Structure formats: C-alpha cells, structure tokens
Amino acid sequence: MSPHSDTQETSHEATVTGQPDTLVCLTITAYKKPSLSEKEYRHHMTKVHAKLVSPLMEEYGIVRYTMTHNTKETRPMLYQLYDPQFSNQSDYDCIVQFIFKDIKDFLRMKADPRFLEKVAPDHVNFADTKRSTMTVGYYEEFVNDGKVVPKD
C-alpha cells in the first residue's frame, strides 16, 4: 500500500468540474535572478519568455496570462495609494498570473514537449525560483473595462 491515502492523492488533483463559470488563478510572486537588472529581467520576461509560452497558452485554452512588474520606478507610487491599514510594501519583482477554466488545461500545456524543451529550461535565465512563491485560487472579477460585472 502506498504511504499516501487516496484522499491525499486526490486532494492534489482538484479541478473545477461542476462549476462551469468558475475560473482558477495561479499567481506567482516572482523574484528576478540576482545577476539581472530590472530592465534586463522585464525585457526577458516580456520579449523572450512570454513569446515562448503565449502560443502554447492559447492552444491549451488558458484564458489570461499577465505580468505586473514592480520596479524602482513604480514602487514609490504605493505611497500615494496606501493607508495605515495596508502599509506593507511587497518586494516581489513581478507578479505573474495565469487564469484557466480547469487545472488540467495548464497541466496538459506543461506536459507538451515544446514546453518541456523550450519554456521550462528558460526559467533559469531570469527567475530566482528559490525565492519565488506560488498560490492558486478561484478567480473572481467585479469590474472589467470600467464596468461592474453583473453577479447573481
């Protein structure tokens, strides 16, 4: 018998089946490779890595793929926006988000030989994977294009 029970194994295989209007969001709070400047990091992420992976994401039905680059230039903007209740500034270099209908779509993409041969190995060129963290959760949108999104 395996050291993991069926319950433990299936808990890592969650999907959103049965919830057709629910999207899942994988968020990576990313740090750049220490040897790169902010400019080099952003260039590699947006001009090299995104170009490698975006066509695969489209092919596998990924709904959205975004990056928010936090730089020396943008970080001071927070002081215009924050209040005492939310005053802790994050030190991530980038926040990357992937929105998909089912985690199986993302897993199929990651298993594609093109991903394994070109995309996955590229991470060592720009990412500090020891410091970067990830989380996954349900994606909810309340305002889009300046309009309230109708909810039940």
UniProtKB/Swiss-Prot annotation:
Lineage of source species: Eukaryota, Fungi, Dikarya, Ascomycota, Pezizomycotina
Top-rank lineage group of the source organism: Eukaryota
Source organism: Gibberella zeae (strain ATCC MYA-4620 / CBS 123657 / FGSC 9075 / NRRL 31084 / PH-1)
Enzyme Commission no: 1.-.-.-
Keyword Oxidoreductase part of the UniProt annotation: yes
Entry function: Dehydratase; part of the gene cluster that mediates the biosynthesis of aurofusarin, a red mycelium pigment which is acting as a mycotoxin. The first step is performed by the polyketide synthase which condenses one acetyl-CoA and 6 malonyl-CoA units to form the first intermediate, the cyclic heptaketide and yellow pigment YWA1. The C2 hydroxyl group in the pyrone ring of YWA1 is probably formed during ring closure by an aldol-type cyclization reaction. The dehydratase aurZ then acts as the first tailoring enzyme in the aurofusarin biosynthetic pathway by converting YWA1 to nor-rubrofusarin.
Enzyme category, top tier: oxidoreductase
A GO molecular function held by the record: monooxygenase activity
Gene designation per UniProt: aurZ
Biological pathway: Pigment biosynthesis
Ranges where the EthD domain occurs: 34-129
Catalytic activity: naphtopyrone YWA1 = norrubrofusarin + H2O + H(+)
Family named by the database record: Belongs to the tpcK family.
Induction cue: Expression is regulated by the aurofusarin biosynthesis cluster-specific transcription factor aurR1/GIP2.
Keyword field: Monooxygenase, Oxidoreductase
Protein name: Dehydratase aurZ
Phenotype of the disrupted gene, per the record: Impairs autofusarin biosynthesis and leads to the accumulation of the intermediate YWA1.
Transmembrane segments: none
